[in-house]
C-alpha cells in the first residue's frame, strides 16, 4: 500500500496526469460554452498542458485563466476565421454530396474539397498550441501552423489519430470518456509537440520570463 501511494511511482504519475486531464477538460468545456470563446479556452488548455509536458506547471487553474485572459483577443480572431472556413467547407461538402454524379467534373471537385479539408485540419491542429507558445500575427500563426504540420507530418498524423480515437471511444465504446476528452488529447499532443516547438523557436516562455525579470 505504501508503494502504491509513493509519488515517485509511474502508476501514481499516470493517475495524477489523468486527474489533471479531467479537471482541465472541465475548465475547457465550461469556458467553451459561449462557442465564441472556444479559441481562447483551447489556447489556455494547451498553455497548461505544454507546461505540464515540461514539468513546469504551477497551479492549473491560475495558469489556465491567465492564458485565457492574455490570449483572448488573438485566439478569438483565429477561432472565428477557422470557424468560418470550416463552415464553408462543411456547406460545400453537403451540397456536393447532394448534387454529386459520376463524371470527371464532380470527381475533381470532390478531390479539391477533400484536399482543402485535409489542409484545414492540419492548420486547426497546430493553431492554438502555437498561439499558446509564441507571439505572432494572425496570418503568421496560420502560416506557421500549416508549415509545421506539413513538415512534421508524422507528428501531425499521430495527433489526428489521438483526436480520432478519442472521438470513436466516446461515441461508440465508452461515453463517460468525454470526462477526459479534450484535456487528455491536449496533454498527449503536448508531449508530441514539445520537441517540435523547441526546434522551431526554442523556449519563448523562458525568454519572456527573463525579459520580465530584466525589466523589474
For the regions a language model picked out, list residue spans one by one.
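Helix-coil boundary and N-terminal low-complexity module in membrane systems
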Residues: 1-109, 120-216
Amino acid at each position: 500500500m505504501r508503494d502504491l501511494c509513493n509519488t515517485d511511482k509511474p502508476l501514481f504519475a499516470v493517475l495524477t496526469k489523468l486527474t489533471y486531464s479531467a479537471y482541465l477538460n472541465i475548465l475547457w468545456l465550461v469556458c467553451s460554452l459561449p462557442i465564441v470563446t472556444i479559441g481562447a479556452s483551447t489556447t489556455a488548455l494547451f498553455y497548461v498542458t505544454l507546461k505540464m509536458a515540461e514539468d513546469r506547471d504551477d497551479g492549473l487553474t491560475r495558469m489556465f485563466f491567465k492564458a485565457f485572459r492574455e490570449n483572448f483577443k488573438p485566439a478569438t480572431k483565429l477561432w472565428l476565421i477557422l470557424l468560418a472556413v470550416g463552415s464553408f467547407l462543411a456547406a460545400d461538402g453537403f451540397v456536393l454530396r447532394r448534387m454529386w454524379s459520376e463524371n470527371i467534373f464532380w470527381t475533381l471537385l470532390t478531390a479539391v474539397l477533400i484536399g482543402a479539408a485535409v489542409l484545414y485540419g492540419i492548420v486547426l491542429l497546430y493553431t492554438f498550441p502555437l498561439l499558446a507558445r509564441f507571439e505572432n500575427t494572425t496570418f503568421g500563426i496560420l502560416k506557421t501552423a500549416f508549415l509545421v504540420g506539413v513538415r512534421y507530418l508524422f507528428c501531425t498524423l499521430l495527433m489526428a489519430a489521438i483526436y480520432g480515437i478519442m472521438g470513436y471511444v466516446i461515441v461508440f465504446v465508452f461515453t463517460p470518456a468525454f470526462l477526459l476528452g479534450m484535456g487528455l488529447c491536449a496533454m498527449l499532443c503536448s508531449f508530441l509537440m514539445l520537441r517540435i516547438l523547441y526546434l522551431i523557436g526554442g523556449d519563448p516562455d523562458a525568454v519572456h520570463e527573463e525579459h520580465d525579470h530584466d525589466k523589474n
